[in-house]
């Protein structure tokens, strides 16, 4: 029988890394798909996906289960996408292509 997200989260909070790895396997594709839809670039979407799971792992002790794990994970991913978009808008002029004279 497959463990639920809630069971895997509880085990992960108890220090079971294998349970967190199961959550990654379960949610990696949907999180990547979300990041790709928002950002539109494969490499950057992969980075956001990886950062999402890193942030989730670090914040897991504070996860109280008031929302579904998937909702919490999607919110982390969307916040990281928003941060990525903001950084792109603030790219320095030196990174922009020069006009041909």
Residue ranges and their predicted role:
Residues 20-22, 35, 64, 93-96:
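Short, hydrophobic secondary-structure boundary micro-motifs
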Residues 33, 47-54, 67-79:
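Structural recognition of an alpha-helix C-terminal capping motif at a helix-to-coil junction
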Residues 13-22, 32-51:
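Short, charged helix-capping/linker segments at alpha-helix termini
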Residues 13-14, 40, 53-68, 87-88:
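Sigma70-family region 2
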Residues 1-5, 91-101:
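Internal acidic/polar
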Residues 61-65, 75-95:
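Arg/Lys-rich amphipathic alpha helix in sigma70-family domain 2
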Residues 5-8, 19-20, 48, 69:
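Hydrophobic side chains within well-formed alpha-helices
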């Amino acid at each position: 029988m497959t463990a639920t997200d809630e069971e895997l989260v509880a085990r992960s909070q108890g220090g079971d890394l294998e349970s967190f790895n199961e959550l990654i396997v379960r949610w990696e594709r949907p999180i990547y798909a979300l990041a790709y839809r928002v950002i539109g670039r494969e490499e950057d979407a992969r980075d956001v996906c990886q950062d999402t799971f890193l942030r989730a792992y670090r914040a897991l002790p504070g996860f109280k289960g008031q929302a579904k794990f998937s909702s919490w994970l999607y919110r982390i991913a969307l916040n990281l996408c928003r941060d990525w978009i903001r950084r792109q808008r603030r790219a320095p002029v030196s990174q922009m292509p020069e006009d041909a004279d």
